[in-house]
Amino acid sequence: MDQAKSKALEAALSQIEKQFGKGSIMRLGSDRTMDIDVISTGSLGLDIALGVGGLPRGRIVEIYGPESSGKTTLTLSVIAEAQRQGLTCAFVDAEHALDPIYAAKLGVNIDELLCSQPDTGEQALEIVDILTRSGAVNLIVVDSVAALVPKAEIEGEIGDSHVGLAARMMSQAMRKITGNLKNSNTMCIFINQIRMKIGVMFGNPETTTGGNALKFYASVRLDIRRTGAVKEGEEVVGSETRVKVVKNKVAAPFRQAEFQIVYGQGISKAGEIVDLAVANNFVEKSGAWYSFEGNKIGQGKANTMKWLLENKPTMDKLEGMIREKLMSKPQAETSARLATQEELADDY
């Protein structure tokens, strides 16, 4: 770039920053660290599958799945992890179905959790926008998009046609809150339900409610499914759960994680650590016995999990080893890619 153009560009950049604030425009390569501020999901496997160690702050996240698949449990787990970091959380309960006793069992501090039960969809989304613009709330959960009923539909009669009202409402809200979420570094999680498209012969007939705007604006979309039951003898004590990262703007998508949700306790962290430690050869499995550093720690997965819960230092050590091995790769790849870009730039 010649000197005259360079001076003109610098003057334009200076004017933009003066008018709209510092950081309103920048060179993409100026911030080499590219560190993403995240909140853990409470699931070690899912944090790894997300590629950055959790859900990104300042972004929109969508979690969807069938009924009783663990959507609310996963979001309450995220809230509990956020509160452990000292963050302020809000729960917009459009379904009017939040159980504070269950939330407390999952580790949520219900005394510190802000909760709203709005009457209309517009009211719910306006509350989200006000909380976001305040800059004082770090995580907002909306449960659920399907329950965000437009005011016109509530005031009308059953049987009245309201085609596209919810989709238009969501589209307008996404345009309004996305920039505010980024500026305030607030994460907004939308829980969504599944519907079936009528007359689909080929492909997946499943779709989510609320139109297409949320699909486009969400940085992360998680598809959560119940794959089986967790039993103790004949009694069902939980569910096997699989989460697929359907969309990811901050790392590689299409990874998945499997974990157990134990009724009344939430995500089984010990179970995940056992599975991941065996898969990465930190724990040896011989027949039914599990061994760590040459010592037998349990016969069967259930006993091994129990042993880990009773020996917290070993459990923390294993978690650290798993995180170090599986979460350091993306950073190393990023550094290598930046180094390659610098070499190419030098060649030119």
UniProtKB/Swiss-Prot annotation:
InterPro entries, per the entry: AAA+_ATPase, DNA_recomb/repair_RecA, DNA_recomb/repair_RecA_CS, P-loop_NTPase, RecA-like_C, RecA-like_N, RecA_ATP-bd, RecA_C_sf
Q: Where is this region: Disordered?
A: 328-348
Localization, per the record, is: Cytoplasm
Broad class of where this protein is predominantly found: cytoplasm
UniProt GO MF annotations: ATP binding; ATP hydrolysis activity; ATP-dependent DNA damage sensor activity; damaged DNA binding; single-stranded DNA binding
Q: Which GO terms describe its biological process?
A: DNA recombination; DNA repair; SOS response
Q: Which domain of life is it from?
A: Bacteria
GO (cellular component) term, any one: cytosol
Give the binding site residues for ATP.
65-72
The family database entries (Pfam families) matched by this protein are listed as: RecA, RecA_C
Key words, A-Z: ATP-binding, Cytoplasm, DNA damage, DNA recombination, DNA repair, DNA-binding, Nucleotide-binding, Plasmid, SOS response
UniProt family annotation: Belongs to the RecA family.
Alphabetized NCBIfam families for the sequence? tigrfam_recA
> What job does this protein perform?
Can catalyze the hydrolysis of ATP in the presence of single-stranded DNA, the ATP-dependent uptake of single-stranded DNA by duplex DNA, and the ATP-dependent hybridization of homologous single-stranded DNAs. It interacts with LexA causing its activation and leading to its autocatalytic cleavage.
Record-given protein name: Protein RecA
Gene behind this chain? recA
